């Protein structure tokens, strides 16, 4: 068995034993660069080659920024990290780049939590909240594909959210412990089995699932977590006679290999000597910290810390895992106090390129991750729930993130002040090859806005076009959705409480025409590619603030720029400075495009794109993953070092099948089971309220209301409530609140 030789040379991870030559990046597209694209591509490529560390691509909506990214990556040939501000945009980018690079590795890396409750302590009520989570196996598979691809080839594009700045374990251990099975190299079957166990594969001779292997005589079947199909290894003595990919159901051989690496079943694997050293250093830190607490007369905290740490050490020594093992990551990695964790970025070669999409949102997001994570853990440390080393289980600080990336390209229609300040090369991409103009903008009074909006919506629906409506709050979005439903309009809403994969599905239903209107807040701004949308309505446009500043308004206006009949209506009583600046900038871009169209004889026409998204990735994953979501304990081999990448992104567990609503699933349950569920949820609701987790309490309250309505029989509003539930298909808990009319100015 040839193991991977791993070493750091000048900061770069060197890998050996990977079979096959490098494949160059190759864009497959019927189109050639046009409009502003050729100059933008040339300038960006030259900037990278000249050594410019920071560049900005100011590209308007619909100008083909993704195509420009693809052609730039093709010309440079560098492994590339593409970062997006949320999972929805990451999904869209991954899908588009996969179309451009069908013969290269385009992989998706986001937080794999469907639900995540972090460990926390509330001193005011003396309440300790244990960590709880539910993991999406399809997304976990895609994460493993990302790291496996990075260690196997150079033609890799990873599309990621800020999850990529959170710790996932050492790449040296991950690559160094992976067995490289080669027919030419002697290998005993038992040695191979022991190697699989060391990299956290579980033996299961009856049910071959991801992360497991089975043994039948001299045949060992392994199902890597990153693979679409299991691998079969046939032995004869110390010879490997067959290495093949097989169909997991029929056992049919799909492809044969001469050699292949088997990457670990977990991103966090570690050598036994490191574990022993970690046990010693954890014990020493505990002894020191307990003495500090006793010296300040914090006897309860000292006793609590000693008891918890002793238990964790015993579990680590005997079982190899413990609850909350991620809090000991610094010791297990062998890092010094304050040193940053290993992240996905450490799996990239030294000459990587980083493209940050919608940089005006993503950059501040990266900046804020560290402090938000630290504030919660400081409380745990101060009250004796965790050792101080738990603070080193954290995301990267912004300066640490920048230090790991050799070159950046910031992409946005409205770059932030930081990007513009550090940029060494500003590139504008204003002209759209399609000739599409920025939308016309109409400012209308607030009085009568809802009646006016209904009329505009019905006009678009008659033309089989779609409408986006942006509000300022979640409550306003939900109330407006209910009002439009009552008016007979097919509508849904989307905000931060909407589960991640549900967002993708909701956008898909909008494009397919299953709904005509989508109501949202800031999720309807950056990057959404919706050519069917011909109208964007901005309510309360004159309310200055984060959601109605110049950048936000320009981004929102851009959602109507992919349709030849695009129009924006701002409902406002006064024209604010932000509104005026956004309107003027839109008009400037519109005039540039009109001049280009006139010069080249172009007639603007809406480009109808195929309705693709990350669900294509998920569909492939679902072929081999049975469960939609699962709870997972913390262990050395089971993803213990992951933390959610976006505040509020976790949502609730996706346990409802996509084709079945919550109401349909509940209707299949017996009456007694529904009563038990309600009682349990009411208790959880009270506990959440006592812990001051009011958002969780409100979510549970809405679910209780919905189920109780089913138990007590349908009300006179049964039809409306059923419509509301169907409109929220895919969300684990649809809103159960009964609205008493829409609270808007009529």
Regions found by a protein language model. Give the residues of each.
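N-terminal cationic and glycine-rich segments that engage phosphates or anionic surfaces
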Residues: 13, 109-158, 162-452, 456-462, ...
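Conserved helicase ATPase core of P-loop NTP-dependent helicases/translocases
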Residues: 478-479, 492, 498-521
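Pre-Walker A (Motif I) flank of P-loop NTPase domains
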Residues: 49-56, 77-79, 154-156, 465-466
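ATP-binding Walker
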Residues: 63, 88, 523
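Walker A/P-loop
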Residues: 50-73
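Conserved helicase motor "Helicase C" RecA-like lobe of SF1/SF2 P-loop NTPases
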Residues: 171-176, 471-501, 706, 710
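Conserved pre-motif I regulatory segment
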Residues: 8-58
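Conserved Walker A/P-loop ATP-binding site and its immediately adjacent core
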Residues: 75-99, 105-114, 163, 472-475
